[in-house]
């Protein structure tokens, strides 16, 4: 990957001049000028996903200039480098190959000259065998009972992805009850364990190093809870499995290393649901559905790797995001799924995007002089409409939004889905086109009120519109289509990081807080007054000590 400051390119300067011409342009004008705008600014993937980006503040010229930026920063070479297994995560000297985990074509992918696919396939086969024994009832707990509940203990990428997918694909789940524990707050593990039976509960401890503070604290509490009933440590092996690479620590914990599922340093945590970290997904949905999830992602991988940029969906969405973030000053993007099963999707890509591209040093180690990753947030529709859409519609912030919905519901109750989708369509229309003062007054006039009668309230009913949105309409949310959708967003994030000249696949920003927490923890063991920090931190620690007793 080349290290090119995007803001110093000719394409960036051209975009800056173009922005001056575009900043006052109305989306409504763009539609008025082009009756086929939808056709010109939308694309379908695999006849399963429609991406409509026509309700954006863009023209053909805008996209041409954004594509010029991608060319000048050598995006195509960056894509090739990732798929070729080059060590593009340079700060950790690692390849970035989550695409290998779902490489259903099984073509060789090399890291340091070694094909990784045999190992990938071996772990998949091991997970298939293990999951089939648990799901089928062959795997027994220490009293001979079959497993009814599975608790995944992890944090960050070892939790967010599997939790999101098992929720999104709940219509496909089997009889096993799936639980996820992440927070080191004892309340999380305590509340999760309350209704469970130690005789029928299986724990998955997801930590590559088997040293992650939050995960191992929860794992030891789960082990203590289990042994409080089981008594004998030899029974731990029947109720715990590990998603890890630290065989020594796994064995010392009491887990049979035959039930340790490995992954590799070229798998980043927030891109790891496709790996052994996805074992909870397999146990919830079955291996066949996990394979379909992989296949959908692989199909998007092929699209991303081989489709020209002008028709490449992750590239298009990435470029539009850069346009708003760097030229319009938009600081956030909202992800708004109109599907209740997808209620964790925004949280998943909050980590996916913000941990990946929340960087302020470029690939040369210099401070950036442009915007990098946006703030990502969102909630399912229609709930959000009754919470924060007010600000999106009439506030002073520009918030580009992704609206996501399936055409087919898994729960076709009465007219629920039609009402849901009518809101989905209405919101993007309202955000784009708004409602003028003239229309407001005309509506009042139709109700028999004069302009003078309503002049005190009319300004508050005006919607400026010109709020940009992307609409992603899926035929149905299935393991395959969800896999493709997740990969779409993953590659969007990669594209933005490549163009913005930052390292997308490290996360050094999480380290300082952990270091300081490890330093502070021993200071909390007694009641002595602390004075080794700044006055604020000292004051907080000392008040905590005074109040905890």
Curated annotation (Swiss-Prot):
The keyword Cytoplasm applies. Pathway: Carbohydrate biosynthesis; gluconeogenesis; Carbohydrate degradation; glycolysis; D-glyceraldehyde 3-phosphate and glycerone phosphate from D-glucose: step 2/4. Keywords: Cytoplasm, Gluconeogenesis, Glycolysis, Isomerase. The active site is at 355 (proton donor), 386, 514. Its EC number is 5.3.1.9. One of its GO terms (biological process) is gluconeogenesis. SUPFAM superfamilies: SIS domain (SSF53697). It catalyses: alpha-D-glucose 6-phosphate = beta-D-fructose 6-phosphate. PROSITE patterns: P_GLUCOSE_ISOMERASE_1, P_GLUCOSE_ISOMERASE_2, P_GLUCOSE_ISOMERASE_3. One of its GO terms (molecular function) is carbohydrate derivative binding. It holds the Pfam family PGI. Catalyzes the reversible isomerization of glucose-6-phosphate to fructose-6-phosphate. This is Glucose-6-phosphate isomerase. It comes from Pectobacterium carotovorum subsp. carotovorum (strain PC1).
